[in-house]
Design a protein with these regions (language model features):
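ABC-type nucleotide-binding domain
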Residues: 4-205
Length: 205
């Protein structure tokens, strides 16, 4: 089964409940909502309330215990993991970087990411300035785990990597926490302007 080409990343949760394998307690019970393209859906709640668990169900890091999740009307269990995850740009709470250049990090996970998309993604993620300030620019080597860049720079590169995939759905799991106020505001403004046709899901603490 594949996604309908003409559709644009609408997500629907239908009576979704979830508990971890072997657990008695449900973390999520009877969740119903729709997230549409061109809209931002925010998940706000205290630590441990299940926000991250909920969004981790969309790329199928876990499967629902009951109910179903649809993307463009198709149950995500009927679609290959490859096709599902190609449709999603996901930024986890702690964005991981790998040893290699900034370019190889930004193009990781996307099969055919062009230089144009890479540069645009870095611009939206407010990463262009600090990348340009480095002598080798996008060819700058990153240490394993990103130990030679700051927390805010690491987060911006993780955001740029997700954006470079040019997906229809973008999920940000508390992904702006290491950014200063000014950078955060600029990044949110750029995301709203540049990704106005995408489906955005944002977890906030």
């Amino acid at each position: 089964v594949s996604f309908k080409v003409e559709e644009k990343g609408e997500i629907e949760f239908k009576n979704v409940s979830f508990k971890y394998p072997g657990a008695d307690e449900y973390i999520l019970k009877d969740i119903n909502f729709k997230a549409k393209s061109g809209e931002t859906t925010a998940f706000i709640g205290s630590t441990g309330s299940g926000k991250s668990t909920l969004i981790n169900l969309i790329p199928r890091f876990y499967d629902v215990t009951s109910g179903e999740i649809l993307i463009d009307g198709e149950n995500i269990k009927n679609v290959s993991l490859h096709d599902l995850r190609e449709k999603i740009g996901f930024v986890p709470q702690k964005g991981m970087l790998f040893s290699g250049t900034i370019e190889s990090n930004l193009k990781y996970g996307g099969e055919h990411i062009s230089d144009e998309y890479m540069h645009k993604a870095a611009e939206i993620a407010q990463a262009t300035e600090f990348i340009s300030s480095k002598e080798s620019g996008f060819n700058t080597e990153i240490s394993q785990g990103g130990t030679n860049v700051s927390g805010g720079q690491k987060q911006r590169l993780a955001i740029a990597r997700a954006l470079a995939k040019n997906s229809e759905i973008f999920i940000f799991d508390d992904s702006f926490s290491a950014l200063d106020f000014k950078t955060d505001a600029k990044l949110r403004k750029a995301i709203n302007e540049e990704l106005s046709d995408s489906t955005l899901l944002i977890v906030a603490q």
